[in-house]
Regions:
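Structured binding elements
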Residues: 73
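Alpha/beta-hydrolase fold active-site loops
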Residues: 70
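Conserved short histidine dyad/triad with adjacent acidic residue
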Residues: 30-67, 81, 85-86, 96-100
Length: 101
């Protein structure tokens, strides 16, 4: 497949995550968060698919916000604490369109 992004060993090699080109991400009032963009297929109306890896450092915060489309949260390292509880490594949370958190 041409132009495919291959990210290997993200689960088995925890250092692989540290080697990605993370960029600071402050959208929706985030603090202590970084983003690694995978793709952005949104159109001019901000509709369409987008995928990224997010890294939340200890003490990270996010203000409540709406997701117009699905959001998949897969915890690669550490523990995610949100309004649905505490989620350890290996947890996949599927948030439906229209969800807020």
């Amino acid at each position: 497949m041409k132009n495919a992004k291959i990210l290997s060993n993200l689960i088995s090699d925890k250092d692989a995550l540290d080697n990605l080109n993370w960029q600071p991400h402050r959208r929706d009032g985030r603090a202590n968060a970084d983003i690694f963009e995978l793709y952005d297929g949104r159109n001019n109306n901000n509709e369409g698919p987008k995928a990224a890896l997010m890294r939340y450092r200890p003490g990270a915060t996010v203000k409540p916000h709406l997701h117009p489309g699905y959001e998949l949260i897969f915890v690669l390292k550490g523990t995610l604490i949100n309004d649905t509880g505490e989620h350890p490594e290996g947890t996949l949370e599927v948030c439906p369109p229209g969800s807020t958190h």
